Amino acid sequence: MSAQNGMYYSLLEWFKTLNLNAPHANAEELSDGVALAQALNQFAPESFTNSWLSKIKSSAVGSNWRLRMSNLKKVVEGVYEYYSDVLNYTLQPDFAKPDVQAIAEKCDLTELERLLQLVLGCAVNCAKKQSYICEIMCLEEELQANIMRALQDLESSTRQSVEGGGVVSSMSRNSLSNMLEGNTKAQEERDAMAQKCFETEKKMLLLIDEKNNLQQELQKIQQEFARLELNTIGDDGVSLGPIQAGSVRYNELRRQLELVKEELLQSEGAREDLKIKAQQQEADILHMQQRIDELMKTTAELTSLKDEVDVLRESTEKLKVCEAQLETYKKKLEEYNDLKKHVKMLEERSADYVQQNAQFEEDAKRYANTKGQIELFKKEIQDLHTKLDNESSKNVKLEFDNKNLESKALALQREKDSLLKERDNLREAFDELKCGQLSTNSGSLTGNTVSRELQPAAMVDKIQRLEAENKALREGQGGQTALAQLLDDANKRCEHLREQIKAANERILSLTHASQSDDPILKENELSKQIKQLMELNEQKTLQIEESSTQNSAMQCKITQLESTLSTREQELMAYEVKYRKCVEKAKEVIKTIDPRIASGLEANILEKSIDVIEEESKTKMSTMEEQLMTSAYYRLGVNAHRDAVESKLALLMGSGQTFLARQRQSAPRKSLTTMKSK
């Protein structure tokens, strides 16, 4: 294990302790990102959800480094979002973002070390951080030191938005570092004491074995001494006999006894030495046990301190939450004070509105009095309408009779002119025919002195045709029979023409007699008198209509003023109602936010009832105002229609003495602006 990659291997050993489904034993297995995603899901399932985990492609990754890179990108983005959104940490630019491409292609250990460092920060700051910290504490000391260094590096490169530290708070960091140092020292002392205890136990076992051996030798010597004291014969037949001074046996026993005494002295010295050593070792064991008890107490204190640190962390978090709640409550208090002031203002405004409503009611009563006057005017207007309709019908009849008489007079005049022209023409034709007959009787057919220009067109045609026939007869040298027939035909035609001339003369005479007997001048005088009378009547009616129109215009001005005041009052009432509702809703919200127990149901019911009463009053007022507006609009429309009808009839009466084309050339009467506005 190199010094550069020591932190990576320590983080990998910690990562191996996690219970994951995906393989996570080496860098190649971690480079696909599946195990890292499962670990994040295990740390914070509320942030790294199962739907997010399903986006990580676990199957068909293999050696495809692009798929591995996409998985690692998702993991890195999720970790950064967790740091910024959930933990409220921002990583400083000196902490480089892990290179996903290098991990996916080359399994770069330094980049993978950064990624594992970020995952470690997530584990230390998640909801189950106590269990993961305990697992880290159960690792070896070297691994713990590397992991602690990784956490310190991550903490130095993070910056929290709210005051209070990085990944681990300053207070907990100092306490953890002190606890780790004390724990390492205690473990070293525990190992040294255990080694000493093991050595002393070995020495104790050796001394016990030596003691047992010495006891066995003593027993053997005592048995030999008892055997020698007996007066028995030995196996070689020599009588051992009693022990006497100077005997061989006595000397041997004396020598053996001295040897045994020396050995006893040596064994007693050794025993005393061993006793002293045993006492020293027992004292050492007692001291070591006391030391172990002290270390156990320190470990218990350390665990209690860890618990206190966790409690302090939770209390700091709760304190932050409480501070935030305090700020919100302060803001709500300020809003409540503002709302109190606003409610006072609204109460004053509501009092003003009540006074204004009373004034509006008085105005409505006044308008009710004016309503009776308007109805009287309406009845008068209706009577005038009926009179005007009758007069207009009479005028129409007179106009029609006048037009018929004028048309008859014009027709008679035209017929008279045409008859006079025909009479003159017939006289001329008659004179010419007389002259023609005289010329034929004398035998000079060609010597006609009558000018053809004075003859009528039909006679000229006939004469030309007869002359052509005469020429044809002369040129063709026909028989006398043909000439006789032609002469007979010509005579018949002349007789027919004479009969026509006689009938025309008779008709002229009858027409002249009729024209003289009818006397059209008298009729024209009578018609002119009737037209003058009708014009005088029309002028009287126009004067009456103008007077009624002036009265109607004055009434319309009053009605428009009243309608404008009513519309302004209605708009003000609507604005006041909207403001009142908003204020009531704000007051309800304020009462609910202050204390829901104060805002009882009775007060809410009272407020709702008052609101309903005000709404009903406003609806009734609005309905009465709408009815008044409808009646005024209806009267205005009737007056405008009546005025238009009168103006059109007056225009017709004024143009009755003119021709049809002259009346068409005249401009139509313009409609008033009030009618255009009302439409």
Swiss-Prot record:
The keyword Coiled coil applies. One of its GO terms (molecular function) is microtubule binding. Residues 140-627 form a coiled coil. Pfam families: HOOK, HOOK_N. It comes from the Eukaryota. Residues 5-123 form the Calponin-homology (CH) domain. One of its GO terms (cellular component) is synapse. The keyword Cytoplasm applies. One of its GO terms (biological process) is cytoskeleton-dependent intracellular transport. SUPFAM superfamilies: Hook domain (SSF116907). Its main location: cytoplasm. It is found in: Cytoplasm, Cytoskeleton; Endosome; Synapse. Gene3D superfamilies: Calponin-like domain. Keywords: Coiled coil, Cytoplasm, Cytoskeleton, Developmental protein, Endocytosis, Endosome, Microtubule, Synapse. Homodimer. Interacts with microtubules via its N-terminus. The coiled coil domain mediates homodimerization. PANTHER family: HOOK PROTEINS, PROTEIN HOOK. Involved in endocytic trafficking by stabilizing organelles of the endocytic pathway. Probably acts as a cytoskeletal linker protein required to tether endosome vesicles to the cytoskeleton. Involved in modulation of endocytosis at stages required for down-regulation of membrane proteins that control synapse size. Not involved in synaptic vesicle recycling. Required in R7 cells for boss endocytosis into multivesicular bodies (MVBs). Has a role in regulating adult longevity. Belongs to the hook family. This is Protein hook. It comes from Drosophila mojavensis.
